[in-house]
Amino acid sequence: MNEDLISQIKEVVTAENQEKLIKIIQLLESSNYELRGKINPDLQLSASALVFKEDKLFFIEHPYQKELLLPAGHVELKESPLDTAIREFHEETGFFAKKMGKLVDVNLIDIPFNETKNEKKHQHIDFRYLLELEEQEAELAELPFFLLELEEAPEEFKKYYRYKNI
């Protein structure tokens, strides 16, 4: 059921991330549920956008967790994770990213209980794509966003700054 996702993950396996990605592949292989569209309350797909403007990476302030994260969101039914990353980047920052992207990482993220939405704790398999910023005027952003240099970024995202000149 999740062969398309598994094949994408296999393309980014390195010695550095092999153990983590094998665990995610096994999770996808054992899942009998559609993971797009929030159908499965325990395990869902999300996608994040890594977009640089010069040496700075875009971050948003998450509306519930109140922390700086990459622009991201749930993968909708019949949507690819890449399309989600592009859509969410635009919605959350108002900026546009080119319809191209390179998968650079996949993570299993524990999402805490959300009292506001009465959403139980669950996990996301998060596909992280490097996207290129389009040179056009931004529209209205849904969320506060920040352009941060390496030294200002949350620790877990600092490893992505190696992609800034690709």
UniProtKB/Swiss-Prot annotation:
Q: Please name the InterPro entries in this protein's record.
A: NUDIX_hydrolase-like_dom_sf, NUDIX_hydrolase_CS, NUDIX_hydrolase_dom
Q: Where is the signal peptide?
A: none
Keyword Metal-binding attributed:
yes
Q: Where does Mg(2+) bind?
A: E88, E92
Domain of life of the native organism: Bacteria
The record's SUPFAM superfamilies line, in alphabetical order, gives: Nudix
According to UniProt, this protein's pathway is: Cofactor biosynthesis; tetrahydrofolate biosynthesis; 2-amino-4-hydroxy-6-hydroxymethyl-7,8-dihydropteridine diphosphate from 7,8-dihydroneopterin triphosphate: step 1/4
Q: What does this protein do?
A: Probably mediates the removal of pyrophosphate from dihydroneopterin triphosphate (DHNTP), a possible step in the pterin branch of the folate synthesis pathway.
Regarding protein family, the annotation reads: Belongs to the Nudix hydrolase family.
What's the protein called, per UniProt?
A: Probable DHNTP pyrophosphohydrolase
Species of origin reads: Lactococcus lactis subsp. cremoris (strain NZ9000)
Q: What is the lineage of its organism?
A: Bacteria, Bacillati, Bacillota, Bacilli, Lactobacillales
- This protein's encoding gene: folQ
